[in-house]
């Protein structure tokens, strides 16, 4: 929070500021299901991380040249082995089942599409009236078990048994209407997952 305040106190020294937010800004102690950016002022996170992200998201709206990109989950090639999709591949290669501790509905967004959104903003922030707070999510919503199914439907992937310890839990997803309205040519979930598989080793 102090870092953000330091940056905005020097806004006169640069043209635009991009910040990254988390779905935790909506309070992970509550249900977060296809939540709209407009709900940020109605949520009060209980931990320091979520609260700081929430306060920054509110502050962003006071400035015309500050933009806030919110991620709920992110994936991309070269990610560490414990990440969800890479661990699916590694467990399958080792003939090990993959354990889902809580089968929540969750949004994941590819790093390639993060870069595409950022480039769109860099090229258009001073030409168009762009949303200053935006969820980076795809329209389709999946639970973790179904996301594993999407991943294993990619040609060449090898499926592994999935063990679900708890069949449901609080959702962690955002509304993607603002992003869809921008009509950016995104690669999407399936193509992004195929890229992760292609660069698995």
Segments (PLM) and residue ranges:
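Active-site helix of classical SDR
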Residues: 48-52
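NAD(P)-dependent short-chain dehydrogenase/reductase
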Residues: 58-106, 111-115, 119
